[in-house]
C-alpha cells in the first residue's frame, strides 16, 4: 500500500459504481486512480481537496484503498476558473509519474490563495506556480539577460516572446509585467 498526499485534478465516470480520478500527488506526480463510488466511500472525488491517500498499485492505474481529508480549498465565484486553469496546466503538460514535491507545494499554495479576495496575492501565486511548472518542465527562459544579451534592469519592463525570449517592452507601462 502506497501512502501519499494528493489532490483530485479531474474525475470521470468509469462504471456505475466506480470513478476514475486524475490525482496530483506529492510523491508520485500525476497518476490515475480507480475508486469505488458509494455512500460509504472513504474518499473524496471533489477537486481542490487535499487528502491523504492510501493506494494500491495496479497495472494500468492505482486503486483507492483509504482516504482522509486534510484540507479543502474553498474557492468561490470567478476564482474557480483560475483553479480549473491550474488543473488543466497539470493535466496537459505534466507526464504521468513525474514526482515533484516542490511543484506540488506551489500548486497547493496557489489553490489556497484563490480562497482569498486579495487579487494581488492570487496573481502572484498563479505566476509563481507557472514559473515552477516551467522550471519542472525544463522550459523556463533565462531571466538574467534579455534577448539582446543585456542584463535585466529593475527599472525596465520586459515581456516573454515565443522565439526571442525575454525582451525589453517597447512602451512605458504603469504596472510592471513581472513584479
Model segments located where?
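Non-catalytic alpha-helical scaffolds and adjoining flexible linkers that form interface surfaces
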Residues: 1-18, 24-179
Amino acid at each position: 500500500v502506497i501512502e501519499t498526499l494528493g489532490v483530485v485534478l479531474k474525475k470521470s465516470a468509469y462504471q456505475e459504481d466506480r470513478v476514475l480520478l486524475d490525482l496530483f500527488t506529492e510523491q508520485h506526480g500525476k497518476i490515475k486512480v480507480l475508486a469505488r463510488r458509494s455512500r460509504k466511500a472513504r474518499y473524496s472525488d471533489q477537486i481542490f481537496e487535499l487528502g491523504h491517500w492510501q493506494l494500491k498499485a495496479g497495472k494500468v492505474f492505482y486503486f483507492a484503498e483509504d482516504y482522509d481529508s486534510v484540507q479543502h480549498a474553498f474557492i468561490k465565484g470567478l476564482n474557480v476558473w483560475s483553479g480549473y486553469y491550474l488543473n488543466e496546466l497539470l493535466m496537459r503538460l505534466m507526464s504521468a509519474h513525474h514526482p515533484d514535491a516542490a511543484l506540488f507545494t506551489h500548486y497547493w499554495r496557489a489553490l489556497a490563495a484563490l480562497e482569498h479576495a486579495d487579487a494581488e496575492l492570487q496573481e502572484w501565486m498563479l505566476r509563481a506556480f507557472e514559473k515552477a511548472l516551467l522550471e519542472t518542465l525544463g522550459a523556463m527562459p533565462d531571466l538574467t539577460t534579455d534577448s539582446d544579451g543585456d542584463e535585466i534592469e529593475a527599472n525596465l519592463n520586459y515581456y516573454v516572446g515565443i522565439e526571442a525570449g525575454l525582451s525589453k517592452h517597447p512602451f512605458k507601462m504603469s504596472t510592471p509585467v513581472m513584479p
